[in-house]
């Protein structure tokens, strides 16, 4: 365990209210270190020096047994000092602020230009895409019109075929009905017999007729 004490010296200068005299006085302090000063002694606290020991490994191979290392901590204290910027530092700070403002304005203009460029490029691309979509929609509309036209024509053609089909089969059905009627009429004209019998107190009367059709002529025979 070891004790360490450090003495710190602080130099305070007398300054007048006049700024010019104060600046000259500071320059003298820089040139003469023995100007009016005050020594302040501060007792440092007792600190335990760190103790690092190693009995094996790389340290042992390098320095052998009993390798020890010690580290001491040194601390110091400072008093409050008044910091005054010089004219050169003030001018430099002003130039830095102006340069910063110019760079910020330049960055803003560059950002706005880049944003405008990208926006214009996007707008043109959208116009091209929109034009493509419009033309494609026009083509699609024409295709729809053609499709509906073809669909209507096909529908009308199908209805005509349906009507023709119905008419054809209706004609055949009428032909069959005509043949049936014709056969019935021919059969009834071919042989027709009429018999009439009347009974009375005075006697009876019998009457009969027979009709036979040959072509369009008819032969009638009557018996009383």
From Swiss-Prot:
UniProt superkingdom: Eukaryota
Induction or repression: Expression is highly induced during desiccation.
Keyword Repeat among record annotations: yes
One term under GO cellular component: cytoplasm
Record bears the keyword Cytoplasm: yes
Biased composition (Low complexity): 1-13, 200-215
Localization annotation: Cytoplasm
Basic and acidic residues biased stretches: 24-38
Keyword annotations of the record: Coiled coil, Cytoplasm, Repeat, Stress response
Region CAHS motif 1: start-end pairs: 122-140
Region CAHS motif 2: start-end pairs: 159-177
Disrupted gene: phenotype observed: Affects slightly survival under dry conditions but does not affect survival under frozen conditions.
Region Disordered, residue ranges: 1-38, 200-224
A single GO BP: response to desiccation
Coiled coil regions in record: 83-191
Record's function text: CAHS proteins are cytosolic heat soluble proteins that seem to contribute to the anhydrobiosis in tardigrades, but their specific mechanisms are yet to be identified. It is possible that protection during anhydrobiosis might occur via the stabilization of vitrifying small molecules such as sugars, but not via the direct glass transition of CAHS proteins themselves.
Family: Belongs to the Cytosolic-abundant heat soluble protein (CAHS) family.
Extra facts: Trehalose, a disaccharide essential for several organisms to survive drying, is detected at low levels or not at all in some tardigrade species, indicating that tardigrades possess potentially novel mechanisms for surviving desiccation involving tardigrade-specific intrinsically disordered proteins (TDPs).
Domain notes: CAHS proteins contain 2 repeats of 19-mer peptides designated as CAHS-motifs that comprise each two octapeptides connected by a tripeptide.
Record's protein name: Cytosolic-abundant heat soluble protein 77580
């Amino acid at each position: 365990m070891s004790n360490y004490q450090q003495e710190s010296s602080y130099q305070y200068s007398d300054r007048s209210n006049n700024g010019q005299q104060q600046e000259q006085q500071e320059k003298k302090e820089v040139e003469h270190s023995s100007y009016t000063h005050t020594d302040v002694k501060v007792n440092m606290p007792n600190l335990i020096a760190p103790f690092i020991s190693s009995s094996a490994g790389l340290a042992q191979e390098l320095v052998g047994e009993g390798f020890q290392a010690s580290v001491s901590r040194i601390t110091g204290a400072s008093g409050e000092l008044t910091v005054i910027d010089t004219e050169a530092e003030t001018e430099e700070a002003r130039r830095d602020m102006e340069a910063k403002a110019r760079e910020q304005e330049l960055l803003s203009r560059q950002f706005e230009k880049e944003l405008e460029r990208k926006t214009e490029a996007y707008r043109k691309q959208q116009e091209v895409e929109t034009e493509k979509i419009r033309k494609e929609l026009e083509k699609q509309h024409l295709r729809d019109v053609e499709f509906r036209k073809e669909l209507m024509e096909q529908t009308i053609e199908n209805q005509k075929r349906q009507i023709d089909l119905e008419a054809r089969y209706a004609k055949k059905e009428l032909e069959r009905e005509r043949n049936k009627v014709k056969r019935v009429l021919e059969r009834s004209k071919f042989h027709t017999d009429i018999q009439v019998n009347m009974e009375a107190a005075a006697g009876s009367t019998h009457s009969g007729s027979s009709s036979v059709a040959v072509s369009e002529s008819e032969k009638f025979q009557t018996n009383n």
